[in-house]
Regions:
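Interfacial segments of multi-pass membrane proteins
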Residues: 62-66, 77-82
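Alpha-helical transmembrane segments of multi-pass membrane proteins
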Residues: 52-56, 99-107, 164, 168
């Protein structure tokens, strides 16, 4: 979607803008869980899934490559930062592998449709839902292979439904507003 605003810019400018936005989204993915845990306690991450929204935004705004990158880097950077700076890893080491795969899928799948969302921002609603289903399917498959029971996994999915609903509303709303702003800016140039 940011390509809309960068159509007349050089490749170097496009890459610089996309890299900057990606870094900001990774920082957001590290910061939002900290805020959620400070407000809602230890279970807030599982309920609100705050690290997932920046990957969805990255995919929709920047495309699949950047969405995948933000999705993979977010839990890794969060793990490293919280381990070194706070002394308590978040996500926990046992959760890191599936979160890398799951959040990476969120960014990848939402990014596969970024060009279509740019043309018709209303499509961001089904795109976010598809990315969420894909990511949760990866979560389920990975953890079943790792030997966790379906019942405990289903409980985890149900716990995160509040966050999924919130993302399904907020991410498309942000995409629609940004698309309108970018189109308005493009017309005024």
């Amino acid at each position: 979607m940011l390509d809309l605003a960068l159509t007349k810019k050089s490749l170097a400018v496009k890459l610089s803008v996309k890299a900057t936005v990606s870094v900001l989204l990774v920082v957001m993915a590290v910061g939002l869980p900290q805020i959620a845990h400070a407000i809602g306690g230890a279970q807030a991450g599982s309920v609100w899934m705050p690290m997932y929204m920046p990957a969805l935004l990255a995919g929709i705004l920047l495309g699949w490559q950047w969405g995948l990158g933000v999705g993979i880097l977010s839990p890794v950077v969060s793990f490293g930062f919280t381990t070194l700076a706070l002394g308590s890893a978040m996500p926990a080491a046992s959760r890191l592998p599936y979160m890398i795969l799951e959040i990476g899928a969120y960014g990848l799948v939402s990014g596969l449709f970024s060009t279509r969302v740019q043309k018709n921002p209303i499509l961001s609603f089904p795109v976010v839902l598809l990315a969420q289903v894909s990511g949760r399917a990866i979560y389920l498959i990975y953890n079943l292979i790792a030997g966790r029971s379906f019942a405990s996994l289903w409980s985890g999915i149900q716990t995160g439904m509040v966050g999924l609903y919130l993302q399904a509303i907020l991410v498309p709303a942000i995409a629609i507003v940004l698309c309108k702003v970018l189109k308005h800016e493009q017309k005024s140039e």
